[in-house]
Amino acid sequence: MTPRPVGRTIRRSAGPAGLLAAATVLALTSAGLPATAGPPAAATPGTVRDAAQASAVQAGSQSGGSELSETTRLADRRSLVVGDRAYAMGDETGLYPATGWHIRGEMGGFWTQPLKLLDGIWFGLDGAWLGQDVAAAKYTSGHGYQRIDYGGNVSVARTDFVPDGVRATLVGLTLKSSTAKTVKLDVDAHSELMASYPWGWTAPNAGEMNLPDTGSYADGTLQFREQDTPPITNAAPHDYTALVGSSLRPTGHALGANHRGPQDPAVVCPADGTPPAHCDDSVFGKGTGGRLTYSVDVKPGKPTTVWFAVAGSDDSPAAAQREYKKAIGNPEKLLKAKSRDRAAIDAMTSVDLPGDRLLQQSVEWSKQNLADSVQEARNLQIRDVNEGKSYPAPVGTVDVARWFGAGFPDYPWLFATDGEYTSYAAVAAGQFDTAKQHLRALRDVSDLLNNRSGKVAHEVTPTGDVYFGSNTSAGNTDETVKFPSIVALLWRWTGDNRFRDELYDFSVRNLQYVYRELDKDNDGWLEGLANVERSGMGVEKLDSTVYLARGLRDLADLAASRHDQTIQQWATTKADDLEKRFETQWWMDQAFGYADSIDDPANPANDNTPIFQRHWTGVTPMEAELVRPGKPTSPLASPEHAAIALDQREKPCYTGEFGLFHTGTGPTADPGGNPGASCDTVVSGVKSERAIFSLNTSIMAVAEGNFGRLGENQQQVYTTGNARIQLDPDVWETPGAMPEIAPSPDSPANIGRAFTDRSMALQAWGTYGVLWPVVHQQLGVSPDLGHGRVAIVPQVPGGQQKVAGSNIRLGRGSVDVTARLANKEIRTDVRIKGLGATVTIGAVLPAGAKVRAVSLDGRATQYKLVTTARGTEVQVAAHGKTSSLRITLR
């Protein structure tokens, strides 16, 4: 399948020109800006950041990254700004429709984990509300910020961002007029102080736990509070606070039940059933509102910026005040810091892909997507809520948890599955610290929840409530067996033995647990739930088997490095046995692929008969790489079966325009029949699901790359699919954000669905299918710093001539790589910075190519030809900081 070309030119500019407005891009320190943080001076109504101050920051306009803009259907698109302690979601006109489905209609607005603060904040100029009475002309997404432009006699550029380390969101309005004006500026805010758990359908539910908010006015700010003890057994007393205010002193205020700007009176979403096409609030909401009014003098032709902050805390009003003051004291300084941090992220893993500029741009934005996914919460009260059926007393407290939020708006919390896949993208992007913190959080929660059994919790809300993943839950086997592999992944990319040692005991207990509790028939194939659960599946799942094989090899490697011969031998013996029996047990000739599961529980005589249902997990034997001592790293699948299975998955019964279906089409006993192509004769017991998740597509992209299949009809189909849903204006919802699900035959595009019935606007796991294929497979970066070595063996994709990457982080150093393929010559140029490791460089030969000569730094050199899953690799020992390899082909 050939990738479809992008329909419209990607809207991009080479710097955040207009981060605040055309003249106010980044706030640099200058004589015109406040020198210190702190609350604004109290006194003069009408004090603003004036045009002189705005002009002083123009020099910062080139220090940020690129921008993506949208001008069409802005009211149908979700907006998102994120920091590690707060985030906000509305639409791209600056309004705040009721959003999300975990607590229907309540997942948007302003949040600071684990607490929602506001349904929204609305701005009116001289009685005209921005986003409704004054239409939004353009929405722009940048690296760590967003901007909405409005026209009118007084033009407005609204810039939102969330400073990291602060429980607040900042909004800057930059006003500009051709004539002198005094503008009446109204700001409405509607509170909804509500924890991220319980949800709408759980017991107790969100409405039962939520208490009425109260509103007050003091010292120029609106203050909203919710305090008391909910009438729920085991609920604790709380004192939630949200504050709204400005760098400008208000001339008036009002309090009342509404104050939703143009969204009054509110359309209320029901708890369930069919919602209206548009809602403003939910039946669970118990918030209140307020208004602040300002008088702003706008000088002719000179921009005037007014800042607003939404801050809060689940601790106390005093804590909320501290967060508010940190935010509003010097917004420009915080904006500068945000831009500087995002520029540093952009500078790591900087790639040059002249043969695939769309993928290059996807690498850029995927790094930002990862940074946008970082969340942190404090004092998590760990309790097993048993899939929403109970609410026991907490078993303990995790003081601090930091993680990659799975997806916004409905999943911005701690998941094992998501974090484990996302870690591969994170190391490729150089974002080691959050990946480490994610694993620590999983360990800390899991050990409290499961009494140190070794089982990994699946889904943990920022309150500490664990929806699934306790010892009594039926499985999440795959997440538990993947954990040692992610520890090993980070150890190999960082060489951090302390981190290895910190997580080693838990990793050992992971695999001891699954053999003790999830192999009741002692056949070595683990029981329990995994990534896919559908009717008719056997109790032993393919993906759990694959990731167990990888986990055993990785645990053995960790054990060997610690001289733990007992665990090394135990894990190696288990892995050897599993790998010897795998192909015979799981391969199905008639399906041209692997069984999804074995051992039908409804048929005791099943005796491990394979069950084939065409799920995406059938690709995992080709996706997961196994590290075996003395052998090249390779997937579990045999090369012969991998070629057959990958060829099959590229066909229309499995692959659509944007990537891999969740469940392929073909003969089925399901009453709904087969809606698509048939590529085999096996009769499945379930219907197809032609929904294209960005994770499924990532799995396929990685699997293709593991076997050197980088061509236009192979890996590039899937890397292009994920890049397009993130960057193609004909496809995206939120510019630059990797979504959870692509527009698919069985999953229509989000933009046409109600805000309460959408998949995630930003989902971290899709970055796996962009960053890992480029860095690990195309650029060939394969560190093993735990053992003091690194291999850099690139493969230029078919139809291309060059791939390059710089500042690819390895441990405390980095590597630059350039690979070229032209005529009969392959060139690999490598520069190592700050690494004390043995370095091997090389290249993957084109299929059928033969070597005539090899030189290193201009001199003939010895080399090895190594047969790997990717193909034949030329490998050469490199010395020094820079190496230049030339391979001449016959």
Describe the residue ranges of each PLM region.
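Secretory targeting and sorting signals
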Residues: 1-44
